[in-house]
């Protein structure tokens, strides 16, 4: 099982960062390796989203069910994809009116096989830089 824990302190509100991370369809604009993203269903408390990843000739897609607690947490659970196990969460901790700690925690493992090994390398590269990508996107949208 692979675990990823990343965080950043940003001069933006928890609301701004929640909205940015929850804008799944914008991911291909700023997330390295994400070539497609779509919201399949949303009702305000939950979102079903699909991400298409591609890098180095390897492509994989997966779908998550996201539980939304506005401006606090987005919990991710796997609906469909190459994983044996997958769970995670984005957390938004307000530190002041215009300061927030954003955190990403992911735990995942892939099904066996050669394709899974390639998918694991792709996913490791993409997820390892997610928080950095969100930081850059926030600076682009909200200023520095």
Task: Set out the residue ranges of the language-model regions.
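Short, surface-exposed coil-to-beta transition loops
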Residues: 3-5, 59-63, 85-88
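A short, structured loop/turn motif at beta-sheet edges
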Residues: 14, 41-45, 67-71, 91-101
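Short, highly charged C-terminal tails/helix-capping segments
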Residues: 136-144
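Generic structural detector for well-ordered beta-strands
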Residues: 7-11, 38, 52, 65-67, ...
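Hydrophobic ligand-binding cavity/cleft-lining segments
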Residues: 1-44, 144
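Beta-strand/loop substructures that line and gate deep hydrophobic ligand-binding cavities in soluble
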Residues: 78-129
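Hydrophobic pocket/interface hotspot
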Residues: 17, 21, 27, 49, ...
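Glycine-rich portal/gate segments that line the openings of hydrophobic small-molecule binding cavities
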Residues: 38-79, 133, 137
């Amino acid at each position: 099982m692979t675990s990823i824990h990343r965080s950043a302190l940003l001069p933006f509100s928890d609301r701004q960062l929640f909205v940015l991370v929850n804008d799944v369809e914008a991911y291909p604009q700023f997330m390295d390796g994400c070539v497609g993203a779509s919201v399949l269903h949303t009702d305000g408390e939950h979102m079903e989203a699909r991400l298409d990843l591609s890098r180095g000739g390897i492509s994989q897609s997966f779908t998550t069910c996201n539980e939304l607690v506005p401006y606090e947490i987005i919990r991710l659970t796997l609906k469909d994809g190459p994983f044996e196990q997958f769970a995670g969460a984005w957390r938004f901790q307000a530190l002041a009116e215009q300061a927030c700690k954003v955190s990403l925690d992911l735990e995942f493992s892939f099904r066996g096989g050669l394709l899974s090994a390639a998918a694991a390398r792709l996913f490791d590269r993409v997820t390892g830089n997610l928080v950095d990508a969100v930081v850059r996107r926030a600076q682009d949208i909200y200023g520095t």
